[in-house]
């Protein structure tokens, strides 16, 4: 004979029983170990060791920084829209360019006393860095999405064409002064001035709101114009 079906009372009691009621009787042994080791693949470990600079030699660190500066120089000499100069910013290159330009614009102490119109080292240094800071603050006030040091990096590296112009002018002045010499120096300075402006705007223009790009580029134009004027009016 088939088993009798459960009474409605028994079914109701079974359905009202909690789902996890039996888990209260389950106990976990205290002897189960909960220790373990986390293994790192050898390839990942090697990459971390390569990326770490704590154990590298001073010579290797200097060479790595010089190579990075050289790559940024190439970005300025061949300006194109790229985020490399903004992403991997540094101030070593701008410092080197600023010091070298100030040294080339400085006369000897005897000539400086005789001709008071020549800019001194400190004057050139202050003009370049004060101008770069002013342009950076103007960019931030206009709503630019570039950091303070990124802007200083771009403006400093883009002085490179003017450094080349100053070097060429110094070499031309060794042949003496004259109208032809001045016209050649004027042409060189104008070309390098345009190069600096184009290179800097290629990196900074996209960091400004579309309706305020002209307001952000105008101070850059004035900044490099002042530096170019100091180069053009320099006489040994």
UniProtKB/Swiss-Prot annotation:
Protein name: Protein YIPF6
Topological domain spans for side Cytoplasmic: 2-84, 138-147, 207-213
Single GO MF descriptor: identical protein binding
N-acetylalanine modification, residue list: 2
Family the UniProt entry places it in: Belongs to the YIP1 family.
Residues with PTM Phosphoserine: 7
Source superkingdom: Eukaryota
PANTHER family: GOLGI MEMBRANE PROTEIN YIP1 (PTHR21236), PROTEIN YIPF6 (PTHR21236:SF1)
Topological domain ranges for the Lumenal compartment: 106-116, 169-185, 235-236
Key words of the record: Acetylation, Golgi apparatus, Membrane, Phosphoprotein, Transmembrane, Transmembrane helix
Any one cellular-component term (Gene Ontology): endoplasmic reticulum
Transmembrane spans: 85-105, 117-137, 148-168, 186-206, 214-234
One Gene Ontology term from the biological process aspect of the record: intestinal epithelial cell development
Organism: Rattus norvegicus (Rat)
Main function: May be required for stable YIPF1 and YIPF2 protein expression.
Lipid bilayer topology: Multi-pass membrane protein
InterPro entries: Yip1/4-like, Yip1_dom
Annotated compartments: Golgi apparatus membrane
Subunit record text: Predominantly interacts with YIPF1 or YIPF2, but may also form a ternary complex with YIPF1 and YIPF2. This interaction may stabilize YIPF1 and YIPF2.
């Amino acid at each position: 004979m088939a088993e009798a079906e459960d009474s409605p009372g028994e079914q109701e009691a079974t359905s009202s029983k909690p789902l996890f009621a039996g888990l209260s009787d389950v106990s976990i042994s205290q002897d189960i170990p909960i220790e373990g080791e986390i293994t790192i693949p050898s390839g990942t470990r090697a990459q971390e060791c390569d990326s770490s600079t704590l154990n590298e030699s001073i010579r290797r660190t200097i060479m790595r920084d010089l190579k990075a500066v050289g790559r940024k120089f190439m970005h300025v000499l061949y300006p194109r829209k790229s985020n490399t100069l903004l992403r991997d910013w540094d101030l070593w290159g701008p410092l080197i360019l600023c010091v070298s330009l100030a040294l080339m614009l400085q006369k000897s102490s005897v000539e400086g006393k005789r001709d008071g119109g020549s800019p001194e080292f400190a004057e050139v240094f202050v003009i370049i860095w004060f101008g770069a800071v002013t342009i950076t603050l103007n960019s931030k006030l206009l709503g630019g999405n570039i950091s303070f040091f990124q802007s200083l990096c771009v403006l400093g590296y883009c002085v490179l064409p003017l450094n080349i112009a100053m070097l060429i002018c110094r070499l031309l002045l060794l042949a003496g002064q004259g109208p032809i010499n001045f016209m050649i120096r004027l042409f060189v300075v104008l070309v390098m001035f345009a190069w600096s402006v184009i290179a800097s705007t290629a990196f900074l223009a996209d960091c400004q709101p579309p309706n305020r790009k002209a307001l952000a580029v105008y101070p850059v134009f004035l900044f490099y114009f002042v530096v170019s004027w100091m180069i053009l009016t320099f006489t040994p």
